[in-house]
Amino acid sequence: MSRDIQYWAGLIGGRVPMEDLMRNELLLGNEAVALGAVDAGISGVFGYPGTPSTEIFETVERLASGLGPVSTGGVCADWSPNEKVAYEEALGMSYAGGRCLVTMKHVGLNVAADPFINSALTGVNGGLVIAVGDDPGMHSSQNEQDTRVFADFARIPVFEPSNQQEAYDMTRLAFEYSEEVGLPIVMRMVTRLCHSRANVLLPGDSGEARASSLSESGGKGLPDPDDWTLVPVNARRRNERLVRMQPSLVRDSEICEQNMLRLVGARGVITSGIGYNYFREAVGAESEGWSVLKITRYPIPVSLVRQIVDHCDELFVIEEGYLYIERHLSGLLGLHGIALRGKQTGDLPQTGELSPDLVAAM
């Protein structure tokens, strides 16, 4: 049960049928992210087009056309000349107190690298979420780079949904978490999740105007403007703050309710994102006999990884993109005596998209 459903169920005390408060819609993963952002009360969306991310902006833009001005709960939607400009516009709106979404594909994050990396030091005021569409298999891209690695480099948290419902729910949560920790949050999507459809349970008023976060100063009020000026004396102080935050970000990942840890058999799988769906499809009913850790938030939840490692004799790692989780396992835990199978062992290919057939052949 999502946090929204729990909230409404508690609020009405069971007096109103849930079906009168919620509705189902068949949505692309991109549309789910867009609706999650609008329902989180964003004041703006900025982006640069690029498959597989384009529909996120287009969906918000379409909704924004009927929501009126920002001052009355509407959304400013602007395509930008490039991803760097889009990120800087979104960051400026966040500094002013508004919640803001910025969209781009994975290679677009290269263009936005300067403000992206430095925004981890300046921090944010209103919630700032970067929806990035990775393109494993290079359907319309020049490389397969994995946004999790880039975000790790910048020390910025990543949310990675495995289905359209999680894409909606986790986008809303990402804005709350961004304001809680004062950092931008990356929402990592991949092509198959961006462009596939599934039913998503939405609040009855989904897509309607919200109170403008910008007019309310959003976030935590007005921070010290020196935090936004990264001359060395300020940058050193902000860098120390960012480093001190990392253990608490790991703890937040460990208690994230979207993660799933099930300890059953001696064979286990650590998976994330759409890789979890491929595992379920490949193994079928037998999946109930497997120990499973599904990771939905980064930094990697170390204590959950330790639990499944201690429980299992053999571990499989199924992740779309780079060997991000797999490479962290050895460094985090020193997997002595445990058979670890994944991309490093050649059980899965290191290039191209995963599929249920590839997972079944492991």
Specify the residue positions occupied by each region the protein language model found:
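Thiamine diphosphate
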Residues: 2-164, 169, 192, 261-263, ...
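Flexible, low-complexity linker and terminal segments
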Residues: 2-33, 40, 161-362
